[in-house]
Regions:
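Short amphipathic beta-strand/extended segments with alternating polar/hydrophobic composition
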Residues: 1-2, 30-41, 76-81, 187, ...
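Residue patterns forming the tRNA-binding/recognition surfaces of aminoacyl-tRNA synthetases
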Residues: 1-8, 21, 63-67, 94-258, ...
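Short active-site loop/helix that positions an aromatic residue
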Residues: 2-18, 24, 40-45, 114-123, ...
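Protease-associated
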Residues: 6-15, 19-103, 112
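Short acidic-glycine loop/turn motifs at beta-strand connectors
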Residues: 17, 25-29, 130-131, 247-253, ...
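Conserved oxyanion/phosphate-binding beta-strand-loop segments in alpha/beta enzyme cores
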Residues: 48-94, 182-204, 292-320
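Alpha-helical recognition segments enriched in aromatics with Gly/Pro capping
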Residues: 121-133, 237-239, 263-400
Length: 400
């Protein structure tokens, strides 16, 4: 792994079922390594004295239990490991045998592919990480540490357990915040989603009726629509349109309240009266009595994805009569990046609201981006933007 902190949330180890793996005798130990990587890996580990004992298919490792070396340090993980389907080896075709040992550890709390495998196999997600991205008490020895700050200590602990074969530095891609350039940490969080596969082919059928003027942006947009990737509509922020969902603190019953009147009619307590401010923190003070168990219901403290707001523009800003007369609009235009932004949310929400293959626009022109001298997108945060006013002082307007 290139992220030692993910050993705290380790759940499975993956082998490629179609590839060969070798059992290798190294001193008093037996190692398992992908056959393709054996010679190169042993050179990297500076191991010359070893012997191949046998060769097996990756599929043979499906369902075997293994012992995590740091269980004594991580109380929550030690409890999880007692589950039948936890800390087992699995055989999955996504495993890349051309890097490392040809074997990968899976941390469902810190990676999308790992998470999807866990969901498919009904493996519980262990995520002892709080809102400040620090380990909680369930992380045992590492509690209170920012997860990336725990990397070095975890490596030292693995070494002390005589479980470290090799450590080194490699150059690889890593996700960064597009504004601050800080390293990002992937976390499995409880959120709200639109499960777009439930729309069937309505969205793609609607998108195919639109004129895009050029094939490249058209093909890019249609490919994204065809993915039917779940859309996370909730955000863990303070500013924004509050998610209008109340959840029971006891039985977890859910109420969806889409108007001020519905909230007032069901409210158990209105601290600011019936004309309360609809945003946070005021709306968070309102409690509702659960219809099922009479316990207290509290609003889910999420706001909506701001793209949800912009995607709802035709419905939110027009009366029913105005909508019928003006939608679908004859023409929209935006930057090419809006294939995953406004163009996407406008179309998806229009299909959802109508429950039909109806686009909110008849044509959409995706414009290209002006790039800097290195071919990178211009960005104010990066500081590589050219001021059009300065250019117009030097060059003809039609050229600019």
């Amino acid at each position: 792994t290139t992220m030692p902190f993910t050993l705290v949330t380790d759940a499975m180890v993956g082998f490629n079922p179609d590839e060969e793996y070798v059992y290798v005798s190294v001193g008093s130990e037996t190692w398992i390594i992908g056959k393709i990587r054996l010679e190169e890996f042993m050179k990297e580990a500076k191991m010359e004295d070893y012997k191949v004992l046998k060769t097996v298919k990756g599929s043979e490792f499906e369902g075997k239990k293994y012992t995590h070396p740091l269980l004594g340090n991580i109380s929550g993980l030690e409890k999880m490991s007692k589950q039948e389907n936890y800390h087992i080896t699995i055989a999955e075709k996504f495993v890349d045998v051309n890097a490392g040992t040809g074997i990968v550890h899976l941390s469902p709390a810190n990676g999308e592919d790992d998470y999807n495998i866990a969901m498919k196999r009904k493996v519980e997600i262990f995520s002892p990480i709080d809102d400040e991205v620090k380990f909680t008490e369930d992380a045992g020895k590492y509690a209170g540490m920012f997860v990336r700050d725990a990397d070095e200590e975890i490596v030292r602990d693995v070494k002390e357990k005589n479980a470290l074969v090799r450590i080194g530095k490699i150059k690889h891609k890593y996700p960064l915040c597009w504004r601050s350039q800080h390293k990002l940490v992937w976390l499995a969080r409880r959120e709200y989603f639109y499960m777009l596969d439930r729309l069937g082919d309505k969205a793609i059928n609607a998108a195919q009726k639109v004129e895009y003027f050029f094939d490249q942006p058209k093909n890019r947009f249609l490919k994204i629509i065809k993915e039917k990737h779940p859309w996370c509509i909730s955000r863990e922020r303070f500013w924004g349109c509050p998610l209008p969902i109340w959840k029971c603190t006891e039985c977890e019953n859910i109420e969806r309240l889409f108007s001020r009147k519905e909230i007032v009619d069901m409210a158990d307590d209105l601290p600011d009266g019936p004309n309360f401010e609809l945003h946070r923190p005021w709306i968070d003070k309102i409690s509702i009595k659960c219809k099922k168990c009479n316990a207290k219901m509290q609003r889910e403290e999420f706001v909506l994805d701001t793209w949800h707001n912009s995607g709802a523009a035709p419905f939110a800003s027009l009366s029913d009569d105005e909508y019928e007369k003006t939608i679908p609009a004859p023409f929209f235009t935006e930057g090419i990046d809006q294939t995953r932004g406004w163009a996407y949310t406008l179309l998806i929400e229009n299909v959802i609201f109508n429950n039909k293959a109806i686009s909110p626009y008849n044509s959409f022109l995706f414009q290209g981006h002006v790039l800097d001298e290195k071919g990178n997108k211009m960005s104010k945060s990066t500081g590589n933007v050219l001021d059009a006013a300065d250019l117009l002082d030097k060059y003809p307007v039609d050229l600019v």
